[in-house]
């Protein structure tokens, strides 16, 4: 069996010679020395392990391994006799030398602290100057600054946590003596400057910006601050509109009246508040609700730059005609108001339930029997509108369902009517015809008394064709106006 070469790195020195000795060796001698070899006790090994390199050399790692022969070795191996002069020097021992800790004097620490207050990080010129001045190495100075920055960060975090836990801090509160001087410069200097690390307490009075843009929390803020924001709001309104008018020349007398009415409400509440603080809580809540409603009403009335007018659902709006164009609103007379009320009730029967954005015509069943004596509209072929609805049992195609929509103007010409068209015709017959429909083109000439329903001729069809188109557009636009806000409205004619 071929023997591999002995490992030359075993114990950092070459292995001893392997020629035959006068005395038998069971393993190579661990140390090479000039004096005669010391004999070790004979090991009882199996005959196949007589050659020591058959066991000690590991072919996988290329190094000597004792694990193969360990079961055959005695528990107590005799130590070879090694003289002290033959021990390995310290340079051959793979051990990291322990670095001695640097002890700084009090004068050095004071000088380092002074430089740390000037700047937490060292530049190359400062490092060279400071190390030469203190007779220290540059590595020692850099390590001291690194540890000092870490300690400063920990102290800053602890101080910040204490400030948040005990918020708000009293003006006379001083920091502990253990804090670094850099943090003491940020503390309250006799109550003259606010603490930079502590958030300021809640302000006593809100600004006009908060009062204008945070109107949702207006009531809760009033309860907390005891009504001081009313005086601030009054001052804001006086500065914005000193003459009592609106934001521009287009403001109406209604807006001016509401402005003065709101000022009177504010002044009245201020007098009640300053007369005594023992007002019952229930009366105070009622005043707050009334004031909040007035505030919201005034705020929405003044915003005229928006393209679509914002409507508050709970407020009565009797001063405007909603069935006319929203570009040409005008005041209504008594007869016109009654007709408009009927038409508005037919267009949106539930004001709080928004209807989908689908155009309604005279054959729509949702308008049947809603108004005062409003029967269902009858189509041209004497077919009721309820028959046009798909209840799931009939198998109508889309073209069959949309067929009544194509004959919309024809059905209007034949005299089929509902409450919406009646209200619009009554409105168009008054003197407000030009104001109501000036946007959509030239209005039809004034008509005489209309013939009974179902008896219309060619002349009546020509005069009512324009009106039927307007009815359909307004019926589709009313639910969109109530629900859509500032979004655009589009109507497609078939």
UniProtKB/Swiss-Prot annotation:
Residues 1-49, 149-210, 263-293 are annotated as: Disordered. It is found in: Nucleus. Changing residue 317 to K: In strain: Z229. Maternal expression is an anterior cap concentrated in the cortical cytoplasm. Its transcript is produced maternally and sequestered near the anterior pole of the mature oocyte. After egg deposition, it is translated into protein, which diffuses toward the posterior, forming a long-range anterior gradient. GO terms for molecular function: DNA-binding transcription factor activity; DNA-binding transcription factor activity, RNA polymerase II-specific; mRNA 3'-UTR binding; RNA polymerase II cis-regulatory region sequence-specific DNA binding; sequence-specific DNA binding; translation repressor activity. Signal peptide: none annotated. This is Homeotic protein bicoid. The gene is bcd.
């Amino acid at each position: 069996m071929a023997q591999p070469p002995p490992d030359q790195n075993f114990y950092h020195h070459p292995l001893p010679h392997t020629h035959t000795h006068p005395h038998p060796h069971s393993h190579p001698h661990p140390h090479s020395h000039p004096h005669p070899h010391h004999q070790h006790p004979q090991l009882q090994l199996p005959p196949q392990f007589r050659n020591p390199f058959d066991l000690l050399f590991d072919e996988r790692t290329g190094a000597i391994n004792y694990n193969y022969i360990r079961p055959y070795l005695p528990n107590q191996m005799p130590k070879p006799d090694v003289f002290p002069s033959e021990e390995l020097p310290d340079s051959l021992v793979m051990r990291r030398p322990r670095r001695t800790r640097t002890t700084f004097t009090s004068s050095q620490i004071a000088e380092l602290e002074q430089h740390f207050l000037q700047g937490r990080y060292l530049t190359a010129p400062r490092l060279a100057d400071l190390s030469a001045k203190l007779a220290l190495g540059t590595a020692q100075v850099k390590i001291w600054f690194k540890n000092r920055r870490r300690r400063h960060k920990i102290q800053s975090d602890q101080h910040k946590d204490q400030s948040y836990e005990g918020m708000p801090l009293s003006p006379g509160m001083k920091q502990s003596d253990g804090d670094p001087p850099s943090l003491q410069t940020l503390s309250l200097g006799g109550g003259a400057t606010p603490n930079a690390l502590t958030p300021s307490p809640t302000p006593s009075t809100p600004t006009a910006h908060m009062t204008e843009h945070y109107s949702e929390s207006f009531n809760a803020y009033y309860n907390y601050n005891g009504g001081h924001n009313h005086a601030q709001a009054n001052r804001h309104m006086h500065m914005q509109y000193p003459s009592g008018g609106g934001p521009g020349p287009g403001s109406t007398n209604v807006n001016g009246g509401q402005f003065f009415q709101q000022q009177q409400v504010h002044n009245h509440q201020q007098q009640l508040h300053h007369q005594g603080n023992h007002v019952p809580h229930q009366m105070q809540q009622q005043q707050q609700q009334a004031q909040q409603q007035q505030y919201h009403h005034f705020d929405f009335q003044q915003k005229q730059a928006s393209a679509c007018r914002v409507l508050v659902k709970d407020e009565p709006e009797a001063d405007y005609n909603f069935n006319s164009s929203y570009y040409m609103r005008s005041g209504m007379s008594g007869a016109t108001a009654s007709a408009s009320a009927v038409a508005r009730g037919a267009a949106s029967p539930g004001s709080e339930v928004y209807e989908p954005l689908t155009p309604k015509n005279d054959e729509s069943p949702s308008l049947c029997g809603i108004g005062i004596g409003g029967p269902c509209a009858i189509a041209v072929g004497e077919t009721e509108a309820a028959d046009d609805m798909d209840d799931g049992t009939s198998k109508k195609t889309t073209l069959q369902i949309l067929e009544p929509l194509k004959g919309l103007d024809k059905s209007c010409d034949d005299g089929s009517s509902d409450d919406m068209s009646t209200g619009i015709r009554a409105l168009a017959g008054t003197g407000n015809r030009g104001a109501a429909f000036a946007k959509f083109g030239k209005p039809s000439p004034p008509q005489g008394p209309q013939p009974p329903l179902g008896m219309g001729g060619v002349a009546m069809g020509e005069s009512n064709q324009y009106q039927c188109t307007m009815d359909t557009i307004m019926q589709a636009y009313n639910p969109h106006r109530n629900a859509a806000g500032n979004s655009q409205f589009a109507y497609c004619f078939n």
